[in-house]
A protein has these predicted regions:
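Charged, cofactor-coupling segments
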Residues: 1-116
């Protein structure tokens, strides 16, 4: 897994530092001018990752548990790591939600979270 250091970000020109227990959103998207836009949004919790000689590190824990529609994904454009992330995310979604569903909803969730 690729670990990237991200310690701060800018919001409306104001520099903010990430801190434990903050929530943020990850909102990748595409917008076609004059046509439409599509965005996938996940809420993330900032949690401790590890402590080393270089300091204490944080990581993101995904809070949102909803399947991501894979129909528009061009699989050849995804790296191995991106496929693994999506499959692991869908596995977590399935395992977390399946016990609370019944009948057709269970089947819908199973299909929506199949590995790619």
């Amino acid at each position: 897994m690729c670990m990237k250091a991200l310690t701060k970000y800018a919001w409306n020109g104001v520099l903010l530092h990430f801190k434990q227990e903050m929530t943020v959103t990850n909102e990748p998207g595409i917008y076609l001018e004059g046509k439409f836009g599509v965005r996938i949004e996940n809420t993330l919790l900032i949690v401790p990752a590890e402590s080393t000689a270089f300091g204490d590190f944080l990581k993101f824990e995904t809070l949102t548990l909803a399947p991501i529609d894979t129909a528009p994904i061009v699989l050849e454009m995804l790296s191995t790591e991106e496929r693994e992330w999506l499959n692991n995310y869908h596995c977590r979604v399935y395992e977390s939600l399946f016990p609370y569903l019944e009948g057709n909803d269970k089947e819908w969730l199973r299909k929506a979270t199949l590995p790619i």
